[in-house]
Amino acid sequence: MEDFVRQCFNPIIVELAEKAMKEYGEDPKIETNKFAAICTHLEVCFMYSDFHFIDERGESIIVESGDPNALLKHRFEIIEGRDRTMAWTVVNSICNTTGVEKPKFLPDLYDYKENRFVEIGVTRREVHIYYLEKANKIKSEKTHIHIFSFTGEEMATKADYTLDEESRARIKTRLFTIRQEMASRGLWDSFRQSERGEETIEERFEITGTMRRLADQSLPPNFSSLENFRAYVDGFEPNGCIEGKLSQMSKEVNARIEPFLKTTPRPLRLPDGPPCFQRSKFLLMDALKLSIEDPSHEGEGIPLYDAIKCMKTFFGWKEPNIVKPHEKGINPNYLLAWKQVLAELQDIENEEKIPKTKNMKKTSQLKWALGENMAPEKVDFEDCKDVSDLKQYDSDEPEPRSLASWIQSEFNKACELTDSSWIELDEIGEDVAPIEHIASMRRNYFTAEVSHCRATEYIMKGVYINTALLNASCAAMDDFQLIPMISKCRTKEGRRKTNLYGFIIKGRSHLRNDTDVVNFVSMEFSLTDPRLEPHKWEKYCVLEIGDMLLRTAIGQVSRPMFLYVRTNGTSKIKMKWGMEMRRCLLQSLQQIESMIEAESSVKEKDMTKEFFENKSETWPIGESPEGVEEGSIGKVCRTLLAKSVFNSLYASPQLEGFSAESRKLLLIVQALRDNLEPGTFDLGGLYEAIEECLINDPWVLLNASWFNSFLTHALK
């Protein structure tokens, strides 16, 4: 039957049916008759609304393949097939705009011509019996009921069949075809009977032979036979005392359930050690941009041309010198690498025609920085499997690091507004259905709150760098290509702006597997003096490369300009995710949307406008040592976005583990706050699982410290 459903119905319908069943915890592979029934019902709903439109005069018309430009509105709004929250949002929206009474149950369609909700029924029994069942359940005069059967009969409220003969005949023909197809495969009897709750063939299904032996072998301990086990499962009451249940399941398990009280949880233990260091792939709050406004130079949009143009806006270059060496590196090589970039950019300018890409000369400093010829030689396993002391490298345990204040500052900066807009509003066509109107409205409000956010700049910067690096890694595998780090934005006045943050030089990149590493050297401009927080810059060699004149309230001041240089690496899979950083916008929008939905369901109307425009209302943003912080809805949008962006920038196994394990403790604490009297066993084990992820990652350590603030306030 499952195969039949997948062959017989449109894949979109099959997917919707699977979703609906999963929402109710049902398995399409097991409850195959139900699966078929849901698909049939969905298809009838879609066929009911197909080709039916309302023209400019408000008349109902049928258009099968007409002028796509005609101003037509769909006659029916389809409610069936949406997830519950969305379906109720559509229903509420229709009720608010039309004044129709709100139904108690989710109907299938709304008819804009007759201004009424429609309940569609498809039955394998007598139509009048099914009609009465529906009417009894709905108990509403306002909802129109229309029942179809597989035998070509139909029944509708007050014999008003809504649609023309031909449209209804199409539905009946399709139902008859489905029935014949089922019958030819021997599926119809089981399908027909399953609606009436008669005993079906499946229930008398006997397990014999090999299957029976396998079933007997795979019984849990202490069960003598399959019947014995079935009886036990049928009689198992899921509620009640957990200890009893566990001992009932197995003699080996003995869990003492401890009550979880306000005094039970302790704060997470953060590691001691030297302060943690910056490990993002590019500078965040410390980045400095060289920019051109309204770019219109020849070759505008070609990264190398743009970069040279940006470099020319700065006149304060000076002889570079090292101000903060890298502890382990050969620092003069970093200095030589920067000088080489300047020299090769100068060479390009002296050429007649500027090339579109630039491959650096393979100098000794670049070979060193990019780890050329440093990888151990790979030997075929066949050649060395007889070596007696073959073993894996001993790798050092990571050194524990303590939380440093810089990561909180980074996060605060990411939530702030910049004076430029980093995303454009997509051009999306006119809204047709009410749900699209709500969606566009939410998207526009959200975009307005986050388009100028620094986290959005990080998204666009990340997308650009990862795309450029992945492209170069595939297109110029053996070359040390010079890749400018560029972003584009618009100023307050709406002028276009191109920004250069620095350069990347990529190493050899024969990336066969997703996890194969490409090395790169990054060189990024900054005004931050590294000597203020040297621990943050452990992995960097920092040069002083110029002096920049800055306009301040007291006039022009000269500040030293630094170049942060480091060796780094990434992989195909990391670049793929980096290219998709725009997803962070979607994730935070969905979080905001669920807040709006919660408000709307309380008020029983769409609260989008009030939500964004009520400037006096504040919302909880997070917990700090001082207590729960609150802010405007815009601040909430930007904070959620920044969290999502940092999860991407600082993605790591430590973060995965911490998020998964700390969530369990969070749920227990929330249950305590809701007075649900939670109980736990092996709380120590849970703490261990959380704390083994707290090693040295700055973002994870910051999240752990936030978690501790949350614990303190939650348990007051």
Curated annotation (Swiss-Prot):
Q: Where does the record locate the signal sequence feature?
A: none
Query: Broadest EC class?
Result: hydrolase
What are the names of the required cofactors? Mn(2+)
Q: For this UniProt entry, what is the primary localization, expressed as one broad class?
A: host cell
Q: What is its EC number?
A: 3.1.-.-
- Please list the GO biological process terms of this entry: cap snatching; DNA-templated transcription; symbiont-mediated suppression of host gene expression; symbiont-mediated suppression of host mRNA transcription via inhibition of RNA polymerase II activity; viral RNA genome replication; viral translational frameshifting
Keyword Coiled coil included in the entry's annotation: no
**Positions bound to Mn(2+) 1:** 41, 108, 119-120
Post-translational events: Phosphorylated on serines and threonines by host kinases, including human casein kinase II.
Per the Swiss-Prot or TrEMBL record, what residue ranges does the short sequence motif Nuclear localization signal 1 (NLS1) cover? 124-139
* Free-text remark on how the cofactor is bound: Binds 2 manganese ions per subunit.
Binding positions for Mn(2+) 2 per the UniProt entry: 80, 108
Q: Which HAMAP family match?
A: INFV_PA (MF_04063)
Self-association state and partner proteins as the record states: Influenza RNA polymerase is composed of three subunits: PB1, PB2 and PA. Interacts (via C-terminus) with PB1 (via N-terminus).
Q: How is this protein named in the record? A: Polymerase acidic protein
Gene name of this polypeptide: PA
